[in-house]
């Protein structure tokens, strides 16, 4: 996951003049000539998340949580491999697949976090972080709602001159989801050290 964060920082610094962090989504780095780097970022995040999924499976947490984390990973892989449509361009199948992968990923992660922290036994490694994971899951879901509403607003009013800072909202969502992933991962690292 650290690789994904470093790549995201690199993209922001290198391409801030071409892709406004306030107005443009992370995926639009693809259209600024950074498709391979963006793809590696998504795939690195998926790989780190897959490691979390394996840790959860080893902790004997079955049910919907591994499935939802698998969907998060699959959505990230789609985002990394299938390019988004250029701003203002006609909608294509690949662009729709990219958008669908993003929605799938961003819907799945907060649900996984919420379900991971259901009350179970006292030896659950996530119990000490239950409140934090739940709060981050809610923050992720609320921020996703803002992102989707912003996207719908832009699509209905025209993307040429957006009045909604979709890029900023998506970056907040990305940061919240990274915090959620790290908070979900930390108990596994702590129990592995024991």
Predicted region positions:
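Interfacial segments of alpha-helical transmembrane regions
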Residues: 1, 60-71, 128-140
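Alpha-helical transmembrane segments of multi-pass membrane proteins
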Residues: 2-20
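Hydrophobic residues within the alpha-helical transmembrane core of Major Facilitator Superfamily
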Residues: 9-11, 50, 77, 114, ...
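Membrane-interface interhelical loops and short amphipathic "cap" helices
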Residues: 17-32, 86-95, 157-166
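Interfacial helix-start motif at the membrane-water boundary
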Residues: 28-47
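Small-polar-interrupted transmembrane alpha-helices in polytopic inner-membrane proteins
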Residues: 67-80, 142-151
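Membrane-proximal helix-loop-helix units in multi-pass membrane proteins
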Residues: 78-128
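Terminal transmembrane helical module of multi-pass membrane proteins
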Residues: 118-194
